[in-house]
Amino acid sequence: GMSISNPSNFYSFVNNQIDPAPNSYAGKELSFVREMSKQTQKFGEVIKAANAKVTTQSPYPTSNSLADQLKIVARLIKGGLKTKIYMVNYGGFDTHSNQTVAGDTSIGYHATLLGNVSNAIKAFMDDLKFQGVEERVIE
């Protein structure tokens, strides 16, 4: 790993290739970092282009971080990316208190989390259908 305190300096460091990397271990590492930076920039441009192709989507629930992530995934799928697997994350399930209300498992923190998951997935599937790309996703 590496720590970057100033992104502008890092950008200049990896893109300023007036001086070739020295023929040393550090030079090999510098060449690797420069190449990864170039590839990341190219991949970023492809992702931006795919995202820009989508101008309308069906509605998603608000205040739902999983729905926000799935909305982006739907845009990238519709935008033409050939990515086979997208990874999203929705935490908060490791609770040990107030998971449900005694006598009613449909009320409580855990029930709310599961409701958010359900609403996010439904919105995602509805959006894929709206976009005409539902056949590109395995349920």
Regions found by a protein language model. Give the residues of each.
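Feature for exported/extracytoplasmic and membrane-associated proteins, marking the mature portion
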Residues: G1-N119, A123-F130
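His/Asp/Glu-rich metal/cofactor-coordinating catalytic motifs and the adjacent surface-exposed loops
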Residues: V133
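Acidic/histidine-rich, metal-coordinating catalytic segments
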Residues: R136-E139
